[in-house]
Amino acid sequence: MSAPGGPLARLEARVTREWQRRGALAWALTPFACVFGLCAALRRTAYAQGWKQPVDVGVPVVVVGNVTVGGTGKTPTVIALVDALRAAGFTPGVVSRGYGANVKTPTAVTPASRASAAGDEPLLIARRTDAPVWVCPDRVAAAQALRAAHPDVDVIVSDDGLQHYRLARTVELVVFDHRLGGNGFLLPAGPLREPLSRHRDATLVNDPYSGALPPWPDTYALALTPGAAWHLDQPALRRPLSQFAHERVLAAAGIGAPERFFATLRAAGLAPATRALPDHYAFADNPFVDDAVDAILITEKDAVKLGASWRDARLWVVPVEAALDPRLIALVVEKLRGRSPA
């Protein structure tokens, strides 16, 4: 893993910037993007035409994913959706790939699991929702194992996996942030895994800057709101973000879109110094030792990777809550129940 602010982090930042414009590098990579797009289209067509059959795991599946590379807010969306489904009378479970974990077979994730064995997002989901969570690169195998262990589960939420067509699904939700589709090019010339025109049941857009929604059908605003920060060593100790306004604060994030976390803090009235860490940063040691600050604000996703050996009293964790549009929840619930929304 690259050091904070090292070559990997700088490369990630440069690629992300290039994907927002149609510059010389993007145009130079378009032949490769055409090949990527052809391969992706053939794979989609194989399932759409019935040449390959998706696997029905016996209960409805809601996929929360994206058509772009990088973080868009899927994890808080999954957490909010699990809570909404539970409130609607369902018993949800969650499957995920377990990115970053050494997982080859279906594995249960509990609040006591380690991020290295479960993946940071699945562990966060397990701790926040208390729902059954299983991980495996083969999401079908994960879903089948989850159902065998929890026969009461009547709906499965797939954290990412939009392109995992082998898993049959009932509802597809695609999440975007303010960058939307970037320059509109497929990988590697742009950030798109699939064309923006890809069919989905609904689109969620989190734009903390303008709040504007693109003119796409079935599109809903996704609001991500920070809660009171809690102390890493003493989770019961909480402080409103406003209390950090007059302190020397560093905000650090090892997520797919760290600037979104920083923008959330600025919107709360803070003006922190910022440090973008590589996505899924492992925190093998403390990268903040030399920082002369009073408080360090980190994301929940990063916090699950910090074990009991961490003893930096400056670390505070900022939880983020996703607010789902009631109309979106109604759409999902009605589709799961096999009825058309009113």
UniProtKB/Swiss-Prot annotation:
Q: What is the superkingdom listed in this entry's lineage? A: Bacteria
GO annotations under biological process? lipid A biosynthetic process; lipopolysaccharide core region biosynthetic process
Q: Give the catalysed reaction(s), semicolon-separated.
A: a lipid A disaccharide + ATP = a lipid IVA + ADP + H(+)
Q: What is its EC number?
A: 2.7.1.130
Recorded hits in InterPro entries, A to Z, give: LpxK, P-loop_NTPase
Annotated Gene Ontology MF terms? Answer: ATP binding; tetraacyldisaccharide 4'-kinase activity
**Residues annotated to bind ATP:** T68, V69, G70, G71, T72, G73, K74, T75
Q: Name one Pfam family in it.
A: LpxK
Record-annotated membrane-spanning stretches: none
- Record keywords: Nucleotide-binding included? yes
Asked whether the keyword Lipid metabolism is assigned, the reply is: yes
Identify the keywords attached in UniProt to this record, alphabetized: ATP-binding, Kinase, Lipid A biosynthesis, Lipid biosynthesis, Lipid metabolism, Nucleotide-binding, Transferase
Gene Ontology CC terms, in alphabetical order:
plasma membrane
Class of this enzyme: transferase
Which pathway, metabolic or otherwise, does it act in? Glycolipid biosynthesis; lipid IV(A) biosynthesis; lipid IV(A) from (3R)-3-hydroxytetradecanoyl-[acyl-carrier-protein] and UDP-N-acetyl-alpha-D-glucosamine: step 6/6
Q: What does this protein do?
A: Transfers the gamma-phosphate of ATP to the 4'-position of a tetraacyldisaccharide 1-phosphate intermediate (termed DS-1-P) to form tetraacyldisaccharide 1,4'-bis-phosphate (lipid IVA).
Cited HAMAP family: LpxK
Q: Which family does it belong to?
A: Belongs to the LpxK family.
**What protein name applies here?**
Tetraacyldisaccharide 4'-kinase
Organism annotation: Burkholderia ambifaria (strain MC40-6)
